[in-house]
Regions:
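Non-heme Fe(II)/2-oxoglutarate
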Residues: 1-62, 72-75, 107
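Catalytic core of non-heme Fe(II) oxygenases with the double-stranded beta-helix
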Residues: 59-148, 153-156
């Protein structure tokens, strides 16, 4: 089940703070183009964001990162579940949109596998449009992808 929240944050200030973490080459994971920071610790998360997430999500923040997609950048289908033995219980993942200056900046698609006990390849994905201050929470074993950003501006 996907939970959809709208937070009330000063996004301009938050974006400035988060851009301080964009100071290295980042890492290559599911991102095809664009930038993904290295993993960051909970202590690094700006308090205004962490406090509002804590109000919405029952759980402990373990790690987070900054993702920036420019024109044509996308994220391939992936999940966040760690299957390395010993296998852990399924956790919670989320995405928070800070900067969404245009339309057509790449919807996030959640695959239908988590919606039914017997999914098929033909299950249509659940589609969510990026919007500023939108927080989406989902199980960490839920496969998801991001469509290409069709704008000349960056989405964060």
């Amino acid at each position: 089940m996907i939970q959809d929240f709208t937070l009330d944050l000063n996004l301009k200030r938050l974006k400035t703070t988060l851009l301080e973490f964009v100071n290295d080459e980042g890492r290559q994971k599911s991102n095809q183009g664009g930038y993904q920071s290295n993993l960051l610790s909970p202590e690094d998360m700006p308090s205004q964001l962490k406090n509002q997430i804590d109000l919405k999500v029952d759980g402990e923040l373990i790690q987070w990162w900054v993702n920036i997609n420019g024109r044509g950048n996308t994220n391939a289908c992936h999940d966040h579940y760690d299957r390395t033995p010993p296998v852990q219980p399924v956790g919670t993942s989320g995405v928070f949109y800070i900067s969404v200056p245009d339309d057509n900046m790449g919807d996030i698609l959640f695959q239908g596998t988590m919606m039914r006990s017997h999914p098929t390849l033909y299950d249509p994905p659940l589609r969510y449009e990026p919007k500023p201050n939108r927080l989406l929470i989902f199980p960490s074993d839920c496969f998801h992808s991001v469509e290409p950003n069709q704008s000349d501006k960056e989405r964060m």
